[in-house]
């Protein structure tokens, strides 16, 4: 079994219909998630958008970390993430591909020095590499009666 680095907890509570308030264990801020139009009201990002955003954000932050360690100056950092929802073999929706385009705003003088950084950072992105490898997801559904609170 791999060595544990950190464990975290995220809680979700239904607001109404498909809207859920997401609470992160170490943050005061919450996030409202919802289903897209046709199912939900599109009041917040949906789970597939959050997964794509997590991949893009992790890659972007990892690139910034590597650039700083290499002493590279970034004039800006931008990312564009495009995900495609497709029908899987069983006919159910699945994320078929997540495409991430990064623009780190490298200074002309740093272009050559940046090569090693740009070739290595991707492997250190925990979210991207976990998604690529497949994640062990374990689901348990409580079967006790609700008290209605």
Predicted regions and their residues:
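Extended beta-strand/beta-hairpin segments
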Residues: 1-53, 64-149
